[in-house]
Amino acid sequence: MFNEEQFFKDDKLVIGDREFTSRLIVGSGKYKDFEETAKATEASGAEIITVAVRRVNITDPDKPNLLDYIDTSKVMILPNTAGCYTAEEAVLTAKLAREALGHGFVKLEVIGDQKTLYPDMVETLKAAEILVKEGFTVLPYITDDPIMAKKFEDIGCAAVMPLAAPIGSGLGLQNPYNIIFIKEAVNVPVIVDAGIGTASDAAIVMELGVDGVLMNTAIAQAKDPIKMAVAMKYAVKAGRLAYLAGRIPKKMYASASSPIEGMIGR
């Protein structure tokens, strides 16, 4: 009996010392409550959920806590340093997260501009160097610059996370060629982060051969977040499988699907 899961069984996403079956990473912000966050995460099939340490409670047991809703035996909590504008703030936030969660994985964000929420590459690189030296598994949020992506790999980051478009914009992938250049430049996983708007955006990104995609607003702010989470699960799988299958080359003119030999009048 045909089983489509055979195509994904051995196709793991490896980050640092961990393996994941799903290549979709989801965020935890912008949902109406933690219950909806948990339902959407489960529906997406994601095995990693990012959490803004400065905005989402994961430490105070006397307040609503995301950890009460997420099964951490199935889903890894990936803390991020969202809201940090300097390397020093990001390093401190990462250390607090490691103490709270008991692991050193961190999605590193150091924002340089409030309007675009573009990352400050100088401060991000500075923070990454410190965190790598202190034993963290660092996944930096970066611009779609292949030169900078290589620098982050060279200092020991476990993955790079270039943006598709500004955070929360829903614009979809704006510069596919730079993402391809990044994928060619580095040997660590490339996880496209930010700017996804709908399922087709996720599929297009994955068709480029990147290792994963991270999204939050596209699911959390959809009219029906649970349905969109399911759509994204299948979009990421479809894009990955299409990449592995190999698309046909683009041609200027038509190419008939059926042979003309034996046709009447031929």
Swiss-Prot record:
Give the originating organism: Persephonella marina (strain DSM 14350 / EX-H1)
Reaction catalysis annotation: [ThiS sulfur-carrier protein]-C-terminal-Gly-aminoethanethioate + 2-iminoacetate + 1-deoxy-D-xylulose 5-phosphate = [ThiS sulfur-carrier protein]-C-terminal Gly-Gly + 2-[(2R,5Z)-2-carboxy-4-methylthiazol-5(2H)-ylidene]ethyl phosphate + 2 H2O + H(+)
Keyword Transferase included in the entry's annotation = yes
- Provide a GO biological process annotation: thiamine diphosphate biosynthetic process
Instruction: State whether it acts alone or in a complex, and with which partners, per the record.
Output: Homotetramer. Forms heterodimers with either ThiH or ThiS.
EC number(s)? 2.8.1.10
Q: What is the protein's known function?
A: Catalyzes the rearrangement of 1-deoxy-D-xylulose 5-phosphate (DXP) to produce the thiazole phosphate moiety of thiamine. Sulfur is provided by the thiocarboxylate moiety of the carrier protein ThiS. In vitro, sulfur can be provided by H(2)S.
UniProt binding sites for 1-deoxy-D-xylulose 5-phosphate: G168, A194, G195, N216, T217
Supply the enzyme class, top level: transferase
Lineage, broadest ranks: Bacteria, Pseudomonadati, Aquificota, Aquificia, Aquificales
Q: Which Gene3D superfamilies match?
A: Aldolase class I
Annotated compartments:
Cytoplasm
Q: What is this protein called?
A: Thiazole synthase
Among HAMAP family, the record links this protein to: ThiG
Q: Which GO terms describe its molecular function?
A: thiazole synthase activity
Q: Which PANTHER family match?
A: THIAZOLE SYNTHASE
Which Pfam family would be a valid example here? ThiG
Which keywords are on file for this protein? Cytoplasm, Schiff base, Thiamine biosynthesis, Transferase
Question: So what family is this one in?
Answer: Belongs to the ThiG family.
Mark the transmembrane ranges.
Answer: none
Record's keyword annotation contains Protein biosynthesis: no
